Amino acid sequence: MQSSSHLNGPTTAADTSASKWTVGDVMALMETWYPAATAQSWDRVGLIVGDPASPVRSILLALDPTAAIAQQAVAGPSGDGQPYDMVITHHPLLLRGASFLPVTDPKGGVVTTLIRSDIALFNAHTNADVACDGVATALADVLGLRDTVPLEPCGTDAERH
């Protein structure tokens, strides 16, 4: 499952292709929706690869950070070789950590591909699962479920999200 998004940010009519967004801006927005503090203790969420100061004009959304996704990110939104600026995945690339990331390793290949093309990689996993209007809510909505409650209340809002 994947989709793409183009961020135009606040632009003028004369400047429609320039982005006013940065990787850091996207990270801050994701933090408001899916706070890292709400992730499970074993989870690894946040910026994996990239520079928070880099501009963002397009984002590739995907479930997993695989080699195929990295190659699609390099190919870009129109496949013309103008890469996406950022990839946001649900599942983390380095859940258990890594001591070495050679290009011959699947995860090392993903990291190398993204770094060579200056593409940021960010993920939101269990923090997106538990968020109000997050992954679980979206799935419940698609399935038509009503009167849902969290399995493990974790928040302080009225619905304990």
Kindly give the residue locations of the regions a language model identified.
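Hydrophobic structural segments
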Residues: M1-H161
